[in-house]
Amino acid sequence: GAPPADSSSASERFTKSVIDLNLVAPLVFSQLARKAMVDKGNDGLIINISSVSGMRANPMGVAYGAAKSGLLNATETLALEWGPQIRVVSVTAGLILTEDSRAFYGDDESVSQIAETIPMRRLGNPEDIANACLFVASEASSWMTGTNIVVHGGGEKPSYLSATTAFEGS
């Protein structure tokens, strides 16, 4: 993750650190993991953890969103380059409730209001992401590579829906 930062005033150092942590580090790790798997003669799997921030606008988080978007592209590219021996899959997390995220989402009332914008009416929890990773690591997903599993409870309600009356009573 990354703390919120206004894109007009975030420092170059901050921006680079967010991109290094969320894009460069996973790429370097993937290269090292691939080498270790190939050197041992093993097929393998690399699971990247991305964020819905890489799939939509991310106010106060442009560097984080850009890095996660880049990670999604890297997943597809590495799968193409390294297949069939190495599979590469992304698991993209929606709004996940953790101790750290509470500082970003606010108090319990704010969390409840945010949850109402999600079709499943709750924020995800770390186990939701872990379960998706377990599926990706299982034999049931052996033909999956270069893809992105989005775990977001159905997404977030588009903001214009709060302003329209077109769907009242639906």
Regions found by a protein language model. Name each.
Residues 35, 79-84, 142:
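Alpha-helical segment proximal to the catalytic Tyr-Lys
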Residues 3-19, 110, 114:
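Substrate-binding pocket helix/loop in short-chain dehydrogenase/reductase
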Residues 56-62, 121, 139:
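Active-site loop immediately N-terminal to the catalytic Tyr-X3-Lys motif
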Residues 30, 67, 75:
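Active-site helix of classical SDR
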